[in-house]
Amino acid sequence: MTQTDYPAPFWPTRQISEEQAAFIEEAADEKAEAVAAERGQYVKIASVARAMPEHRYSQESITAAFKAYWLAQLRSPERLDQFHSRVGVDHRHLAFPMERYQEFASFGETNAAWLQAAEQLGAQAIDAALDRAGLSRPDLHALFVVSVTGIASPSLDARLINRLRLRPDIKRTPIFGIGCAGGAIGLTRAADYVLAYPHHNAAILAVELCSLTIQPDDLSPANLIAVGLFADGAAAAIVSGAKTGHPSTASRAPVREGPRILGTGSVFYPDSEDIMGWDISEKGMKIVLSPRLPELIRKNLAGDVDAFLARNGLRRSDIGAWVMHPGGPKVLNAIQDTLQLEDGALDRSWDCLKRFGNLSSASVLLVLEEVQMNHAPEPGTYGVLLAMGPGFCAEMILLRW
């Protein structure tokens, strides 16, 4: 029997044993801050900032453009209206004017366009995040760059180091293939770095140009949904070690310092490669998006979140801020239901989905920026940042303001 012969879903549902439940109950009596202090895990998100393309369109205008393009192929144009009206998006930013996209004739052309726009947006986002953190370019010791919508060698991080004239001894890490989980995974890797180098500052940049991956000849339901959901943009965050911030490092006061990272967690779901990702061919990147994703979330996420919180001495009821990747209405509703969150707990995610669409790896950083700059929790509030992506996997970060 092959893997595809298994009835859906074929991934293992995570069950909490009696021993795990007892551990969760006992650990919940501890203080997460004390746990973090013992492990030396005091790192902070000094800032987060976005950079969006100048071309902004309403959902209706984008839908109309695709209906006109596919006029001869769509058997029921109203089906596209239905898909696009249900994804919770009002406006999206695109890297190029809509009429430009018809000029791209090959994967090589779209990838070259990705490199051009991604470098520009990435530089803007990094500079904005440094400015908010009260830092300058020489204060940056490590750079983590996440993107799943284009490829380059030398990679995008190398080009940004040249463009911004970052220090020549900067440590750089390009990350590809983790999709919507990328913003959270990048934050985790940056936190790992500054734990090892507590005097250092690291930047995580997530830049995605999803519009350049659209397959114009693909009328599958997954692609029809993708052209109504995904968008373009970038976001960067500065993660600082516990011993930064003295006069020789910080050149000016930060605009508004972000939360501390108290802990991180990763969950990998075996044999779930077909849930999300790319089917890459000579034509480019074709979306893979399984309708079984909400079911995976409902069956597994609550237990995984509870186990993660228990390792840090907390329960779900202790969390006052949920920073969730806005993957779409079905994803957000599945998260809301399985975690039994109060109404309004995911408002910032819904708002970012409405205003920007799904920016893949950058989206969760946009939600974090919105929380930090416009809805900052009270000091002492615990938060969870969570994103999921190809693998299939989930990445969780415990925050405290």
Language-model regions, residue ranges each:
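Acidic-glycine-rich active-site phosphate/pyrophosphate-binding loop
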Residues: 152-166, 205-216, 273-278, 332-346
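Short, well-ordered amphipathic alpha-helical segments that serve as non-catalytic structural scaffolds
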Residues: 85, 117-133, 156, 234, ...
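Conserved beta-ketoacyl condensing-enzyme motif
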Residues: 81-166, 172, 177, 316-332
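Short coil/turn connectors at secondary-structure junctions
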Residues: 39-42, 137-141, 168-171, 197-202, ...
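Secondary-structure boundary elements
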Residues: 131-137, 193-201, 240-255
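Claisen-condensing/thiolase-fold acyl-transfer catalytic domains that form or cleave C-C bonds
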Residues: 3-17, 24-39, 123, 148-150, ...
